[in-house]
Amino acid sequence: MQIFSNKSQKLTILKEKPFKLEKEIQSLFEHNLDIIDNLIFVKSEFKIKDYRIDTLAYDTEVNAFVIIEYKRERNFSVIDQGVTYLNLMLDYQADFIVEYNESCQANLKRNQIDWSQSKIIFVSPAFTDYQKQSTNFKDLAIELWEIKRFDNDLISINPIKRSKSAPSIKQVQHTKDSALDKVTKELVVYDEDYHLNDKSDDVLELYESFKNAILTLSPELEITPKKLYVAFKQGKNNIVSIHLQNKSLKIWINAKKGNLDDPKKLTKDVSNVGHWATGDYELTVSDTKNLEYIMSLVKQVLQS
């Protein structure tokens, strides 16, 4: 992908400035985890047994740990290292909790963590076709992110998307009780089908109507299924989230209390009530009668 600078309608190609050291990438990420992916930085060079994790982070949206590894070279196995580190996390959960509490001066409890949503991210200027193919499974908790640096201090960070036809890792033969077997049993990568299964045709049709309406609001919106809801994100931020119920949809709009103009009073203030997704505004819908109006509420968040 080429990056251009635009000055007075004249485009100039910005040259890539390769990172000389992995530490440069690591430092950039660790100082900007909240901006890059809404993560909390926990520890750099976290030692566990005979291993050293480059960056340990925590995702407060899903209450799970995230391991981040940085690679400048391309001659390594993302599957082998990824599975090893994820298995390490599952085997030594207490060590991860202690490190979080000591580093973040917190009091995180074991039952507050959803270990099933743990994952590892590999960050590199480039990945080989083999590396991309070896992680192209819809339910594998290993992600590849490409990072590049250009002139004028421009940085691009692009998570590599799995193909829509990506198979399940469970279809791949592997030894029972192996590290890969344990990881695939205990970690879950949620997809849209997980939320659509066993729902009535009426609810599925209702969801499709709202989903399509939301996606037409901006080409930047992407669907990101979580354990309890389907999030529609713009970059790293949730804009709106949907939970499919038996006969209706529960919708959360990601705006702080007082920041949403809702003259029809369709939404409910949940700022002081426990709820699943992000945002202080919640509503339940069982038809498309107010679809256009609800989209006007979502649009306020997009334009804020």
Predicted segment positions?
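Charged, terminal alpha-helix-loop-beta segments
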Residues: 1-218, 222-248, 256-258, 268-270, ...
